[in-house]
């Protein structure tokens, strides 16, 4: 797919990489599956960078609009899944 990840110009390179890693984990859940803990670990790091719920919604909505993949539904599914589960959307 050809699209851009939502970014904030004030983020460091390391923070941008972490945010991209989270969005790539969401992509992986849709495309082939990802271990629950791997997805939740990338989400935890994403939340360290984007602690505001409003800002999270803005970035996730932009990503969903570009890709068609829902970070919200993916994380919700992972949280509700049993341990050692592969998350597939």
UniProtKB/Swiss-Prot annotation:
Transmembrane feature ranges:
none
Which superkingdom does the taxonomy of this entry point to? Bacteria
Q: Output the InterPro entries linked to this UniProt entry.
A: BH2638-like_sf, UPF0223
Name the coiled-coil region(s): none
Instruction: Give the NCBIfam families listed for this entry.
Output: PRK04387.1 (NF003353)
Q: Write out the similarity annotation.
A: Belongs to the UPF0223 family.
Please report the name of this protein according to its UniProt entry. Answer: UPF0223 protein BPUM_1362
Which organism is the protein's source?
A: Bacillus pumilus (strain SAFR-032)
